[in-house]
């Protein structure tokens, strides 16, 4: 049997692509080395931020606004346990922060609902937060966080119900291209399709070793927190930059535990077994202490944590491009620790590619040619 589309890697982007391509009427095969959602990639840990006024650059704003529309649509499938929670996101940092300047610029260019607060205004609205006098806050009222594992589970179930073939716990060991399309090799045999999407996350280099992606081990952890830090008390999700440039992110507390992680840093790794569990690196449990001590001093001890992996591109911008010499294979990788919020729209872009539709977005900034 020859498929219209084979998806290699059915985590964040692949799960979305499988759903949108199947919904469009294509004959799709989703594959994954594990059983998604799982703990082996970048999507576990329950929650991910979604920010609209994008500090990583204005080029992302059209993508994230479309992503939000798709997240809202997906959330309607889980109204009792919504995939998107509009908690608001407060971006904290020094007044001269380049990241916050990008947030403000994106908000202005796209007329987004962002409120600027000085240090006193931040602490008056959220007494749990402490910041120096030279800090500002940019509050995104319409942003919030996503239930990452629930989203993937929902997409996979919806795709299956729509008739998508799914081959999980079955690693793809090789990709071949010929005049008839794409063939993948797995331990279960070979499968053919007209087109392929490669969104294998951290370990894309196992299949495509020439791709400029560097896996980095990262951790996040949950700390003791009471109801003051919860959504019910209108405590927001947040990003925060310390005076030394270190960047943190976090979420409102749930079940008396507040999740926080450090965006920069981490350990460069070259194989899956190098991603050791949380607490096996000495700094894991204390990584968030500088932020907590200075900005959220009421938070208690570390309760537990987890390790994940970033698939970093050299410039930490996404890679969305066809493989050189193979226009029937789309590569989506290098999401560099800020990709999950875009999973919905990247899945839609992949489905459009499979249907020979021109993308509605300018994907030029994400081409591989920028590294040449």
Swiss-Prot record:
GO MF annotations in UniProt: flavin adenine dinucleotide binding; N-methyl-L-amino-acid oxidase activity; sarcosine oxidase activity
Domain of life the protein comes from: Bacteria
GO CC, one annotated term: cytosol
Family matches, as SUPFAM superfamilies: FAD-linked reductases, C-terminal domain, FAD/NAD(P)-binding domain
EC identifiers of the protein: 1.5.3.-
Free-text remark on how the cofactor is bound: Binds 1 FAD per subunit.
Cofactor: FAD
Residues bearing the modification S-8alpha-FAD cysteine: 308
Residues involved in FAD binding: 4-34
This protein's UniProt keywords: FAD, Flavoprotein, Oxidoreductase
SS bond list: none
Transmembrane segments: none
Reactions that this protein is recorded to catalyse: N(alpha)-methyl-L-tryptophan + O2 + H2O = L-tryptophan + formaldehyde + H2O2
Statement: the UniProt record of this protein carries the keyword Oxidoreductase: yes
Record InterPro entries: FAD-dep_OxRdtase, FAD/NAD-bd_sf, Me_Trp_Oxase_MTOX, MTOX
Subunit relationships: Monomer.
Similarity comment: Belongs to the MSOX/MTOX family. MTOX subfamily.
Function: Catalyzes the oxidative demethylation of N-methyl-L-tryptophan.
Protein name as catalogued: N-methyl-L-tryptophan oxidase
């Amino acid at each position: 049997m020859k498929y219209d589309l084979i998806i290699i890697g059915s985590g964040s982007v692949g799960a979305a692509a499988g759903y949108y391509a199947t919904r469009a009427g294509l004959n799709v095969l989703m594959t994954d080395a594990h059983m998604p959602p799982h703990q082996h990639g970048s999507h576990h840990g329950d929650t991910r931020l979604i920010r609209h006024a994008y500090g990583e650059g204005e080029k992302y704003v059209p993508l994230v606004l479309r992503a939000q529309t798709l997240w809202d649509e997906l959330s309607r499938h889980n109204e009792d346990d919504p995939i998107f929670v509009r908690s608001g996101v407060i971006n904290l940092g020094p007044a001269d922060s380049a990241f916050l300047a990008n947030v403000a610029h994106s908000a202005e260019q796209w007329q987004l609902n962002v409120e600027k607060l000085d240090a006193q205004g931040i602490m008056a609205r959220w007494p749990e937060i402490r910041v120096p006098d030279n800090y500002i806050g940019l509050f995104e009222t319409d942003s919030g966080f996503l239930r990452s594992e629930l989203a993937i589970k929902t997409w996979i179930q919806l795709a299956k119900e729509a008739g998508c073939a799914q081959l999980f716990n079955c690693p793809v060991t090789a990709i071949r291209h010929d005049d008839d399309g794409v063939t993948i090799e797995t331990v279960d045999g070979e499968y053919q399709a007209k087109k392929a999407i490669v969104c294998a996350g951290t370990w894309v280099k196992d299949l495509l070793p020439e791709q400029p992606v560097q896996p980095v081990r990262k951790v996040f952890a949950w700390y003791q927190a009471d109801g003051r830090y919860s959504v019910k008390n209108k405590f927001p999700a947040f990003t925060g930059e310390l005076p030394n440039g270190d960047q943190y992110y976090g979420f409102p507390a749930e079940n008396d535990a507040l999740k926080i992680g450090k965006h920069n840093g981490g350990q460069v790794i070259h194989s899956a077994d190098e991603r050791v569990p949380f607490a096996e690196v000495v700094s894991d449990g204390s990584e968030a202490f500088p932020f907590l001590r200075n900005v959220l001093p009421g938070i208690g001890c570390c309760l537990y944590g987890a390790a994940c992996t970033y698939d970093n591109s050299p410039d930490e911008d996404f890679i969305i491009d066809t493989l050189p010499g193979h226009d029937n294979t789309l590569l989506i990788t290098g999401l560099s620790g800020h990709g999950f919020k875009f999973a919905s729209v990247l899945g839609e872009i992949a489905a459009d590619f499979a249907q020979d539709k021109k993308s509605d977005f300018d994907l030029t900034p994400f081409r591989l040619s920028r590294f040449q």
